[in-house]
Amino acid sequence: MTQVAVLAGGVGAARLLRGLVDVVPPEGVTAIVNTGDDMVLHGLAICPDIDTVTYTLADAIDPERGWGLRDESWHAMEALSRYGGATWFRLGDRDLATHLYRTQRLAEGQGLAAVTAEIAAAWGLALRIVPATEQPLRTMITLAENEGGAAVIGVGVAAGQEISFQDYFVRLQHAVAVSGVRFAGAEAAQPAPGVLAAIAGAEVVVVAPSNPIVSIGPVMAVPGIRDAVAARRDDVVAVSPLVGGKALKGPADRLLRELGHADSVVGVARLYAPFAGTLVIDEADAELAEDVRAAGLRCVVTDTIMRDPAAAAALCEVVLGR
């Protein structure tokens, strides 16, 4: 059975995984998922990237938003707003059940990897979904001055302030400039059970078309993971999240630029060169293929836009070298 390990985070990774399980047996697929976005809110353990992967693979994701469950209701949020509670991070009524269950199982002493496996099994998934780490790891964003140079960016938010990823991405709608990113807790983190074995045993290690800074970055910040991936460099295939120099979703292109990297597939190539042997780029960036190769990677040009599961499956065939 073909064994594939996928470093994953966000909607792009979820869509790639949806295509991958159509071209290889899902039992041979391990998704190693970013936990830097995780948070505790209303006393609940929330793992947005893990849940997006789970819901997408279960064909239960809301197709319009790209997160949460299809046909969701919002009665709990409406009731919470009456009390003046925090409703900027929207949690649907059925989605709440996932967070309630996860929080209860963690409180009972189960590790996040085991709980994630339980949730995936409950959705009928055959692939393995594992967190990058079970220890607290939080992506923290330092804000830069806005375009007008003003120090105060918004209510309670100022240049130089460090905020959580969800505050940046959801509450502020990533509409602010960034001067730094760090992964709090990374130095004390360890790869979750099964992560290193999945990387070592995979025929192909795939870096999904996720944000290089805030989706792949936290995974690679866990001690041991970057070295394990680099040891497989010839078998590591990364998919660029940029098309024509732009992110299809989210702030990947802006973050690259704001943090001093080229906001193109060349910038992605330079970030990934130490641990990836091949970069798959979109046809819109074909003129940069030689620059990618100059950065030390093989370059494959194809259609990387996953408009539907069939397009995602076709991309995965290319990623697997078929």
Give the positions of each predicted feature.
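A short helix->loop->beta-strand "cap" motif at the edges of active sites that frequently abuts
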Residues: 25-27, 232-236, 297
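Extreme N-terminal starter segment of soluble prokaryotic enzymes
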Residues: 1-4
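Short internal beta-strands
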Residues: 30-34, 234-242, 278-283
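Short Gly/Thr/Asp-enriched flexible loops that form oxyanion-binding sites at enzyme active sites
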Residues: 17-21, 215-228, 289, 293
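C-terminal functional extensions of proteins
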Residues: 249-322
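Redox- and metal-dependent alpha/beta enzyme cores, enriched for Fe-S-associated oxidoreductases
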Residues: 220-259
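Electropositive, gly/pro-rich neighborhoods at or near active sites that engage anionic ligands
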Residues: 33-183
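Active-site glycine-rich loop that binds ribose-phosphate moieties when present
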Residues: 179-199
